[in-house]
Amino acid sequence: MNTSQETLERLAAELRKAEGKGEPVGPLRDVIGATNVEHAYAIQRLNQAYAIANGRRLVGRKIGLTNPKVQAQLGVDQPDFGCLFADMAYGDNEVIPFERVLQPKIEAEIALILERDLPSASTTFADVIAATGWVVPALEVVGSRIEGWNIKFADTVADNASSGCFVLGGPARRIDGLDLRGATMRMSKNGEVVSSGSGGECLGNPLNAAVWLARTMAEFGEPLKAGDIILTGALGPMVGVSAGDHFEAEIEGLGRVGVSFSVDVTEVLK
């Protein structure tokens, strides 16, 4: 599908407007095509450039669609990536305003914090291990600027891989001795377990996902740098979020991470 630069810029602006107004838009695939990866990433990069030009600080990347259960939920069959900005980060057990993310859902992940650059498009598993400074449990709050989560691959890629915000837990651990592949995850919502899985559900190993990201970012000309945060992907199914919810995830060998969402004041006043 032949799409002009002007059209890509218009679609990027529509996504920004959707987030700013809290009003989702229709699927972008109707314009760019459901599988047009090039145009989808072009839209994402336009909004990345806009964000940076307006003072937002890029602090890492998220990998999406690494878990077969999540892929099945969204009807896609390959990973993608999106940007993490400093203003998307929340502290462990902090309260996130419910309106912060459009149509929010949440998933538990393993996060890596790099201490070395990963500049090569032929990055190996060993390279990622050597470059990783810290490993922490994380929660990612995903959201969609596309109405009703009616998305295909091109929609979520253009929409910054459906990123919303994220929470890092602790304690921060060194990677040596950790079994990230075998680590089990249990996530509870208001005290009830609602999602479970393991590191093996994230492209077979969360480090495989990080290798994929390092190679992909090098190919894009934006290689991963020391200090970058990598959200390696969901360890189990994502779960819907309602105002007032509290979530807690425990990842075997890593620790715990929690977050709460504010009560919807408009509902309380009704």
UniProtKB/Swiss-Prot annotation:
GO BP terms in the entry: 3-phenylpropionate catabolic process
Pfam families reported for this sequence: FAA_hydrolase
Record InterPro entries: Fumarylacetoacetase-like_C, Fumarylacetoacetase_C_sf, Hydratase-Decarb/MhpD_sf, Keto_pentenoate-hydratase
GO molecular function: 2-oxopent-4-enoate hydratase activity; manganese ion binding
Pathway: Aromatic compound metabolism; 3-phenylpropanoate degradation
A Gene Ontology term for the protein's cellular component: cytoplasm
Family: Belongs to the hydratase/decarboxylase family. MhpD subfamily.
Job of this protein: Catalyzes the conversion of 2-hydroxypentadienoic acid (enolic form of 2-oxopent-4-enoate) to 4-hydroxy-2-ketopentanoic acid.
Protein name as it appears in the record: 2-keto-4-pentenoate hydratase 2
Lineage: Bacteria, Pseudomonadati, Pseudomonadota, Gammaproteobacteria, Pseudomonadales
